[in-house]
């Protein structure tokens, strides 16, 4: 409930900020503050503070010059504190993220009288992995290197980076660096950084011997101690797809602010899309038998590991993938693009029966392999309890976990390829890319994510604000509602820009002899 006390706090803070900065109040900014505050103030909760009412979302189109950051911060921060909720400000671009963290929030905290803490949340890949650094410094040919299997994760052991890794260790020891890639004194090349970072799949978490000193987990602890977290749409979507609360606070205890909110549907589509490169997949499948033989030799207690069963699964999958190439290759004739990347789109997103049947077989065969890898991953996690083998197992578990995740990703693609779309729902886009050489990449993607966003985000969050300069067509938000799944019963408003462009500028559209959609002709 928006009490008189909260209203007064917001008004006083806003007035103090304007006075301190020498700003003049803008009608559109004041309207935005009121809309956000009223939307959040209408949220009903039970005795545990859990939202019980519907329509907790406020969607505001506000043009350049409105002062959107000040508007939503002035309204949300006092209300969130009063309700005991966290605030997550999410942007689509690094530029706006840095503007908010390094300029806007410090200004607001200093001049408004609102006392709050904030931090910047980043993904795991932005932080150094101590386990991997330790491995690299001890032995350049550690399992994590020699057994990499993703194409974009393959790299050669390069002793020229050893000096960099030793300098990293020295700076960490002196407290001159916090393990954040962005805070290193120079730009770090990707092929130097990748070997000393990890992802959520290959991270062993609390079981890692370096857990207490892990820079990612230290940063995550900070996330749960502050009032306001600034991050990006991708990290929010990743957190939601992991169930919520994996990196960021639980959605039920969070008021989300999506700045540059027009990007949100496309970001969500990217997270729900699947793809698979045939030759690349064959490459990592071929490595599995050798990896497992090496694992079995290193750990005597893995004697019960059924290597033959893994070998059979790999052989079957390799054969099926060759069938994929034979079956899909004739489509190259109808593909569009350049010589190095041709694309064939399946009409209406629908595959022919033969393509779907093969995808169904591959889904089943990949599922068999994934099940075997999942059992092995669980086995290794159990063995981690044995301190005598902990160091070696910490090197092997990420490798097996990564293979398991890769198999799951392949299953997702084959599942999308084998299914027929429900005629009452938007179809999925499905296409194949013919790349240089004989590489063939299959893709499947939703064209609409409104139901997924409703399920993962809008139905769970305590409250949300979505804002951007481009959300509506005139005063009509219906297209944005369809794309995001935000129910029309929520609050929507398109604010007038404080800039009178119509009185100060003229838009001239030149006569052109070519269609702007034809890029080559248009550029000539």
At which residue positions do the language-model features occur?
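A substrate-engagement module of RecA-like helicase motors
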Residues: 2-15, 24-27, 48-54, 64, ...
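N-terminal pre-P-loop "Q-motif" helix
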Residues: 23-48
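Walker A/P-loop NTP-binding motif
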Residues: 37-41, 69-83, 103-107
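Walker A/P-loop
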Residues: 45-75
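Hydrophobic "anchor" residues on beta-strands that sit immediately upstream
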Residues: 57, 86, 228, 255-256, ...
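Signature of the SF2 helicase/ATPase Hel1-core->accessory helical subdomain module
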Residues: 78, 95-98, 103-106, 200-228, ...
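Conserved beta-strand -> loop -> alpha-helix junction used to position metal-binding or nucleic-acid-contacting
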Residues: 86-95, 113-130, 252-263, 276-288, ...
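A contiguous, basic/glycine-rich beta-loop/short-helix subdomain that forms a polymer-engagement track
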Residues: 194-229, 238-247, 376-513, 517-524
